From Swiss-Prot:
Keyword annotations: Carboxypeptidase, Glycoprotein, Hydrolase, Protease, Secreted, Signal
Presence of the UniProt keyword Secreted in the record: yes
Protein name per UniProt: Serine carboxypeptidase-like 51
GO cellular component: extracellular region
Pfam families the UniProt entry points to: Peptidase_S10 (PF00450)
Protein source organism: Arabidopsis thaliana (Mouse-ear cress)
EC nos: 3.4.16.-
Annotated tissue distribution: Expressed in seedlings, roots, flowers and siliques.
Biological processes per GO annotation: proteolysis
UniProt subcellular location: Secreted
Single GO molecular function: serine-type carboxypeptidase activity
Family statement: Belongs to the peptidase S10 family.
Length: 461
């Protein structure tokens, strides 16, 4: 890829105003390969987006090039930062080309959602403007898509694939349904290619019940730890059943703290690691604050790269996003600190955090839209066994046939080592990715790229 440095030349600035207030801001780089901006999705609520046009794009009117909308987890983590620079974007946090960028298979649209994540913001730090539910987050994203797609023929002719990681999966399911409704009512012009759920927090109850047995099986918990874990999981189940969702979120934190203590701080994103291996070490305290959970989500990825041969200022995502990237973009408010409000976003959605969306996945499948699930073998927080448990609760008419299907092995290029398995029936697809934790594109970039190509049906390079 030609891009080895961040583009600095800006060709155009388009600002549309109402009553003297800036509503939408858009910028494009010198060769048109990147565009970014803000959309005011609600009064005083501004959502940031960044679109990369793929240099591998094949112009074929009969088969339009796909575009991927990437949604991060948290809620409160930044897709523009984490998903882009640490996972699938064209450059890594050292601003070096990423060989496994998903631009090889599709255009990429990163969004900081919900508002308050990353570069997105509310005016005057009015916390009551943060969304409180997955439905509200999906509504904001639908408004953003209307602004970006309705008047852009290139975009609205491309199939849009909503790809989500972790908590982003809950919002992605709601967004898929919202997009279908908006398209059918004539409010949105786009073609929904599918919804892809990567290690997604679809059914919190099923996941918390999976943690104890999984960690006992891999020797990170003993019988005492298993019993304690299952006891708190039962409490969470009761709280969810009674609609006590805030209480369930608090008990979820208690359960993570308990498991951390009993397992000598197993990493919830990869059970082969300790959290003490991360830059954010939790070994000094058994009490994990919400903001530390959000920071840990990103800093886990920082730790996957060796920083020993570079200066401390290089490779750090916080410094990158608040430094050279903020300077490049030119439209970020001067007083905005990237990622500074992630905890406020999480707190606002505390009552939504433990709500399941299995019924919404059922509804999505019933529309005929392709739903793809992928899961890393080594993940704990959104474990494969937990994912399989909620999938088996689906009421979709094709579930029994799906369960009967044989899996096919996955390989990476000429390497014949088994990298995973997949199976499909009608519009439900599942990928089991071996050797990967919570962040599949980071741990197994080659097979992840192959998977994305299969999902989007992109031309072979």
């Amino acid at each position: 890829m030609k891009t080895t440095v961040v583009y600095l030349v800006i060709l155009c600035l388009i600002v549309s105003c109402t009553n003297g207030e800036t509503k939408h801001v858009r910028k494009i780089n010198s060769d048109g390969s990147e565009a970014w901006g803000y959309v005011e999705v609600r009064p005083k609520a501004h959502m940031f987006w960044w679109h990369y046009k793929s240099p591998y794009r094949v112009e074929n009117p009969s088969k339009p090039w796909p575009i991927i909308l990437w949604l991060q987890g948290g809620p409160g983590a930044s897709g523009v930062g984490i998903g882009n620079f640490q996972e699938v974007g064209p450059l890594d946090t050292f601003l070096k080309p990423r060989n496994s960028t998903w631009l090889k298979k599709a255009d990429l649209l990163f969004v900081d959602s919900p508002v308050g994540a990353g570069y997105s913001f509310v005016e005057g730090n009015q916390k009551d403007l943060y969304v409180k539910s997955d439905e509200e987050a999906a509504q904001d994203l639908t408004k953003l898509l209307q602004q970006l797609f309705n008047k852009n023929q290139t975009l609205n002719q491309s199939p849009l694939f909503i790809v989500a990681e972790s908590y982003g999966g809950k919002i992605a399911v709601k967004l898929g349904l919202s997009v279908i409704d908006a398209v059918q009512s004539g409010k949105l012009k786009l073609h929904l290619g599918g919804v892809i759920l990567g290690d997604s927090w679809i059914s919190p109850e099923d996941f918390v019940f999976s943690w104890g047995p999984l960690l006992k099986h891999v020797s990170r918990l003993d019988d005492n730890g298993l019993d304690s874990s299952n006891s708190l999981a039962e409490k969470i189940k009761t709280q969810i059943k009674n609609g006590e969702y805030v209480g369930a979120t608090q008990t979820w934190m208690d359960l993570e703290n308990l498991i951390s203590s009993k397992s000598n701080f197993v990493d919830f994103y990869n059970f082969l690691l300790d959290t003490g291996m991360d830059p954010v070490s939790l070994t000094t305290s058994l009490k994990i604050k919400k903001e530390e959970k959000i920071k840990k989500y990103s800093r886990y990825l920082n730790d996957m790269r060796s920083l020993s041969d570079v200066e401390d200022v290089e490779g750090d995502l916080d410094k990158l996003m608040n430094g050279v990237i903020k300077k490049k973009l030119k439209i970020i408010p001067n007083d905005l600190i990237w990622g500074n409000n992630s905890d406020d976003v999480f707190t606002a959605m505390e009552a939504a955090f433990m709500k399941p969306v299995i019924e919404d996945v059922d509804e999505l499948l019933a529309t005929g839209v392709d739903v793809t699930i992928y899961n890393g073998q080594l993940d704990v927080i959104c474990s494969t066994s937990g994912t399989e448990a909620w999938v088996h609760k689906l009421r979709w008419e094709g579930l029994e046939e799906f369960k009967k299907m044989e899996r096919e092995p996955l390989f990476c290029e000429s390497d014949r080592a088994t990298r995973g398995f997949t199976k499909s029936y009608k519009n439900l697809h599942f990928y089991w990715i071996l050797g990967a934790g919570h962040f599949v594109p980071v741990d197994e970039p080659c097979v992840a790229l192959k998977m994305v190509g299969e999902i989007t049906k992109s031309p072979q390079l």
